[in-house]
Amino acid sequence: MKKKIKIGILGGSFDPAHKGHLKISKIAIKKLKLDKILWVITNKNPFKKKPFYSLSERILIAKKIIKNTKKIQVTYLDKIVGSSRSIKIIEHLIIKKKLKNIYFMIGSDNLVTFHKWKSWKKLVKLTKLTVFSRSGYDKKGKKSIVAKYLKNKIIFINNKPIL
C-alpha cells in the first residue's frame, strides 16, 4: 500500500521571507510529521498594499532561507493557476498534482480575518487548517467566525509566537 504523503502549504507574499517562516515550517514538519512543505509565493496579497520587494527578489530570498532544508520547497503558481487566491492554488494542487493530505498553514492573525478570504469554507473542507501563534492574536483567532464554524477541527500549534 502506498504511503499517504502529508504536505504543508504556507502561502503568501513573503515580503520578505524570514527565519520565522523557516522556524514554523520546521515545527510543522516535526509536530505534524509532514513529508514536505511548499512555500507558495504569490505575486500580490489581496489584503495588502504593493509589495516592498519584487516577486523575483522574494523568490530568491525565500530560496536562500530554505537552502539545505530538504523538506521545504519554494514555488510560484500564480501564472500556472491564473490566480493568487489560495482556493485556486489548493484546487490546482489537488487536481493537477493529485495531492490529498494537505495542511493549510496560517498565523492566528490570519484566522481573525479568514472569513473574508475567497471561498474559505471550501478551502477548509479541502485541507486541514493549521494555525500558528502570532503575538496578540491567539485569543482573537480562537474566538473568530472561522474557529466557531470549524469548532474543534482546527489544528493549533502552540509555538513561541512570532511577532
What kind of region is each of these model predictions?
Residues 1-163:
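Nucleotidyltransferase catalytic core that binds NTPs
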